[in-house]
């Protein structure tokens, strides 16, 4: 059984409207999602002793989400991840996007899908959010109708993304939740054991744009096909963290993507997706300056993201999976976050 409760989370400044919170509850999970950016603000999971902790980074009040912050829990779009120099060409026409992360465009621009109010509809086992992104929003061509649906099934949170375009446009939607399976506010994720089912990854340049090479993980720090303890792994390869796309099998079917196990609590997160990639990000840009829930600060490496996605800069790299959505087609992808204990 899933229950859905609807309350007001806060009011946007200058009469911008009410932001609502939807609490989805099952016997195993409690998930809070707000209509601002379709943002997951809390996710309570039990450990092996039956004690629940909130395992996502974020804020207790709306004000936290309205300040400059690193996309905690939000849906990002129209195109998640980076587009090189904020430029791309569709049908012979060049489009220029705002450069919001020098020298590139990141996560849809200055006012991406994470910074808008969505229209909610309560379902029996979840909530669906919708919006229309107007033609030219943040420089993108065509009007885009978008639906993001969160449903709960026992220990599994399912996120479905659908979109329809009036004109050919790139589309790439993901959720940017930061997880810490020890509980948000724990200082780091070094004791998390990570597995990612990818035989290849995308090397990047100094601005985090893929070089175009699809590199085998074999014999590199990116070989996460067998479980590695994150802290020891980063140390042994002398790397400062991950912020890379891992290449999954390019089928539209549901496939296993990643597994993260926190031995001390027993919590396990498994991710399945229909997407061709996942950005594994270890919170390298977190710096402890933001005050989160219950006054916690979030230093570097205090959370990780598994952003299921198309590959970064795919609109400029024809050898990457296709990212263009044409009129009459439907963008439709699903990601499953499955929680359990061992």
Curated annotation (Swiss-Prot):
Alphabetized InterPro entries for the sequence: Ald1_epimerase_CS, Aldose_1-epimerase, Aldose_1/G6P_1-epimerase, Gal_mutarotase_sf_dom, Galactose_mutarotase-like, GH-type_carb-bd
Enzymatic reactions: alpha-D-galactose = beta-D-galactose; alpha-D-glucose = beta-D-glucose
Function: Mutarotase that catalyzes the interconversion of beta-D-galactose and alpha-D-galactose during galactose metabolism. Beta-D-galactose is metabolized in the liver into glucose 1-phosphate, the primary metabolic fuel, by the action of four enzymes that constitute the Leloir pathway: GALM, GALK1 (galactokinase), GALT (galactose-1-phosphate uridylyltransferase) and GALE (UDP-galactose-4'-epimerase). Involved in the maintenance of the equilibrium between the beta- and alpha-anomers of galactose, therefore ensuring a sufficient supply of the alpha-anomer for GALK1.
Quaternary structure and partners: Monomer.
Cell location: Cytoplasm
Chain positions found as Phosphoserine: 14, 124
GO MF annotations, alphabetized: aldose 1-epimerase activity; carbohydrate binding
Chain's gene name: Galm
E.C. code: 5.1.3.3
GO cellular component assignments: cytoplasm
Superkingdom in the source lineage: Eukaryota
Active site per database record: 176 (proton donor), 307 (proton acceptor)
Keyword Cytoplasm: yes
Recorded family membership: Belongs to the aldose epimerase family.
Keyword terms: Carbohydrate metabolism, Cytoplasm, Isomerase, Phosphoprotein
Pathway where this protein functions: Carbohydrate metabolism; hexose metabolism; Carbohydrate metabolism; galactose metabolism
GO BP terms: carbohydrate metabolic process; galactose catabolic process via UDP-galactose, Leloir pathway; galactose metabolic process; glucose metabolic process
Protein's name in the database: Galactose mutarotase
Enzyme class (EC, first level): isomerase
Positions with a binding annotation for beta-D-galactose: 81-82, 107, 176-178, 243, 279, 307
């Amino acid at each position: 059984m899933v229950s859905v409760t609807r309350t007001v989370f806060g009011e946007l400044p200058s009469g911008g409207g009410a932001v609502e919170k939807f609490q989805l509850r099952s016997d195993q999970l409690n998930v809070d999602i707000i209509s601002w950016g379709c943002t997951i603000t809390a996710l309570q999971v039990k450990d092996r002793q039956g004690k629940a902790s909130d395992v996502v980074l974020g804020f207790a009040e709306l004000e936290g989400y309205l300040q400059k912050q690193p996309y905690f829990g939000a849906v990002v779009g129209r195109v998640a991840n980076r587009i090189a120099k904020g430029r791309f060409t569709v049908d012979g026409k060049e489009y220029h996007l705002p450069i919001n992360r020098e020298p590139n465009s990141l996560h849809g621009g200055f006012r991406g899908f994470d910074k808008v109010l969505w229209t909610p509809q309560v379902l029996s086992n979840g909530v669906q959010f919708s919006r229309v992104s107007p033609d030219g929003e943040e420089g993108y061509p065509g009007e885009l109708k978008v639906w993001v649906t969160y449903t709960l099934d026992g220990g599994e949170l399912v996120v479905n993304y659908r979109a329809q375009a009036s004109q050919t446009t790139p589309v790439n939607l993901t959720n940017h939740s930061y997880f810490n399976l020890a509980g948000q506010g724990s200082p780091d994720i070094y004791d998390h054991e990570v597995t990612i089912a990818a035989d290849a990854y995308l090397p990047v340049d100094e601005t985090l744009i893929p070089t175009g090479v699809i590199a085998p993980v074999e014999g590199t720090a990116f070989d996460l096909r067998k479980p590695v303890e994150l802290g020891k792994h980063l140390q042994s390869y002398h790397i400062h963290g991950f912020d890379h796309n891992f290449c999954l099998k390019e089928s539209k079917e549901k496939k296993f993507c990643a597994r993260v196990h926190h031995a001390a609590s027993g919590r396990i997160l498994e991710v399945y997706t229909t997407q061709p990639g996942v950005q594994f990000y270890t919170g390298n840009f977190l710096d402890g300056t933001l005050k989160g829930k219950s006054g916690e600060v979030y230093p570097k490496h205090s959370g990780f993201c598994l952003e299921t996605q198309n590959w970064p800069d795919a609109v400029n790299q024809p050898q990457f999976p296709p990212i263009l959505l044409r009129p009459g087609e439907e963008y439709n992808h699903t990601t499953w976050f499955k929680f359990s204990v061992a």
